[in-house]
Amino acid sequence: IYGHMFRKFGEVDEYKPYFNYNGDYIPERSSHTFVKGFDQIAWLLNEIKVNPNSSRLILSNWDPKVSTKTPKEAVLPCCLTLLQFHVEELSESERKRWLDANYEGGGLKAIVDYCDTGVDVEDEYRKEEIQEHGFGNLLNHYSVPKAKLSSQLYQRSSDCTVAGGWNITQMCLLTHLIAQQSDLAVGDFVWTTGDIH
C-alpha cells in the first residue's frame, strides 16, 4: 500500500454495477469513476532540485477516507504516516570525509590519483591548484555531494515485534534512494511514533 500511496495518492478507480429490482445487471446504468492520483515521489525529486530548502519536502501516506471506512471496506490504514526530508549543505571537511569513506583507497588515494598527471605525483601545478581552490576542484572532480539529505518519519502506529524494524528499514532505504537520485549524501534518519506496542 505504501508504494501505491507514494506514486498514486488519491487515485480513485471505482466501478459501481447497477442491478434492477429483479437483480438483473444493467451495464448502461452502471458507472465507472476514475481520478488520476498524484505522484508524490516524482514531485519530491523535482522539488529537491528546484527548491531544496523547502520545509514542504514531505511524503504523506495518510488518507482520511481510508481511516473512516468500515473494517469490511478498507485495508489497514497506513502506519507510516508522514516522511519529511531536509537538505543541508555539507562543509568542506564533511565533503572530504565523504570522499574518504566512499573513494576506493580513501581520500588520500583520491588526492594522489587527481594529482597524478602520469609524469610525477609531485607536480607543483597540481599541488598549487589544490591549495588555491581549497580542494574544491578535487571534490567536484569526484562528484562529491555538496549537500546531504536527512529524513524524519512520523509513524502513527508501530507493532515492534511484527513490522517496526521493517518499517524503519524501508524508510531508510527510501531516503538512500532519493538521496542517490538527487546527487546528495545521506544524512540522519529520525523516527517518531505515536503508538508503539
What are the residue ranges of the model-derived segments?
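Terminal, non-catalytic protein-protein interaction segments that mediate quaternary/complex assembly
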Residues: 1-197
